[in-house]
Amino acid sequence: MKLQAEKKLIFGYVALCFLMTLGIAFNVLADPVNLNNAPVRSFVQWYSQKSNKAVVVNPDVKGNITVFNADVNQANIDDFFKSVLNANGFVLMAGDPSGVSTPSKLPSQQTDNDDDYEDSADYVPVGDSVPVSAQPQKPLDLTVRNFKLTRVRSSDVLPLAKIFVDSNGGGDVIDYPGNNSLLVSGSAAIMNALADFITSIDVARDQVLIQSLMFETSLVNGVDLSFAAGSASGDKVAGGFNTSALGTALSTAGGSFGIFNGNVLALSIQAVKNDSNSKVISTPRILTQSGQTGYISVGQNVPFVTGKVTGEAANVNNPFQTIERRDVGVSLKVTPVVMGNGQLVLTIDTKADSLTSQMTASDIITNQRHMQTTVQIKDGQTLLLGGLIDSNTTDGNRSVPWFESVPVIGWLFRSHSDSHNERTMFVLLTAHVIKAL
């Protein structure tokens, strides 16, 4: 009996030691998790430390997660980690090391090599990111080719080539302006398609010659240009015009009067020069490519005071003033676009600024006349724009010294005059298409 009691005591002691060892092991392997709106990278770092496994995190993996779990055993830590990632829209991609990414843009090799990745049920679509696969990628059949452009600038073709390459599988396009060419890297299929595309757009553009007459005339008298559209025999025909009637036709600034055929511009220049009530402001000519802006400007670069600091006001020893220079004169900016069937679309921006003789307490005063419009005409036609009225009023006093102050009769030696003059600016513009060789 005594021996049997000793056996029971030994068995109980061994069982107690086993239970204590099991509890210690469970406590060692179990680990509580408490993450409240923590960065997902912190959760990945926790998993890597507990599992002693390396994990690659895609740079696009961002966001926060919340996890409350009483304990996580070492045996099920992988399943727990994967479940938390899937619940928050991420995936664990198998490999050595494994990788955490988003499944929106998985590598194309996934369909052919399903064994290299986790089960497809683990992928939850979310976000816009590029996963980093730990598995070695198959090298692409990349080639580099130089596309020489002969009729257009490479910088103009660069954005079009990039769009074409990106829409056909992707690649790199670099501009080489020194040789007017494009360096492209991509697959052989892209190169063949891009060669045909560049050939179709490497076409010389037409050029447009813009001839213009900017003139001003008296609003009352005007200038007769009716002969400009006359026949070869000198008779006047329909289509001529007289600017004395434009006051009502062009009631708003920048209004369009009409479009004329024939050599209107050359004859109009001579007519304006011969008219005493008219004045030629400028006759600019611009040659530019279709789709490119041509600009010409003639005038003065006038300083304008923009700020002033004096010694008394600012308590400084060196008073100074700031000056900004601005162009004052005549300018013409035209952007022509050659359409089909000899049609032209012109974006016109013209200015005629001038300095006045008046002065204010702060600075000088400038007169500004500005027109901006977009029109469509045919090759060789002449466009008339106008309606910019400049009004000047002049007061004059004249007198004979000493005698003007004589009482009673002093008014006989004094005179006063008022004059009011209104002048209107017109723009005649002719466009000729010069075909590319």
From Swiss-Prot:
Disordered, as annotated region: 99-120
Q: Which InterPro entries match?
A: Bact_Secretion_Sys_Channel, GspD-like_N0, GspD/PilQ, NolW-like, NolW-like_sf, T2SS/T3SS_dom, T2SS_GspD_CS
GO terms (BP aspect): protein secretion; viral extrusion
Query: In what ranges is there compositional bias, type Polar residues?
Result: 99-111
Compartments where located: Host membrane
Q: Which residues form the signal peptide?
A: 1-30
Query: GO cellular component terms?
Result: host cell membrane; membrane
Q: How does it sit in the membrane?
A: Single-pass type I membrane protein
Membrane-spanning parts: 328-348
Q: Which Pfam families match?
A: Secretin, Secretin_N, type_II_gspD_N0
Keywords on this record? Host membrane, Membrane, Signal, Transmembrane, Transmembrane helix, Viral extrusion, Viral release from host cell
Complex formation: Homomultimer. The channel is composed of 14 G4P subunits that confer a barrel-like structure. Interacts with G1P; this interaction results in a complex that spans the inner an outer host membranes.
Q: Which PANTHER family match?
A: PROBABLE GENERAL SECRETION PATHWAY PROTEIN D, SECRETIN GSPD-RELATED
Q: What does this protein do?
A: Acts in the assembly and extrusion of the bacteriophage by forming a channel across the host outer membrane. This channel is just large enough to allow a newly synthesized phage particle to pass through. Extrusion is a process of concomitant assembly and secretion and takes place at specific assembly sites where host inner and outer membranes are in close contacts.
Q: Which family does it belong to?
A: Belongs to the inovirus G4P protein family.
Name the record gives this protein: Virion export protein
The species is Salmonella phage IKe
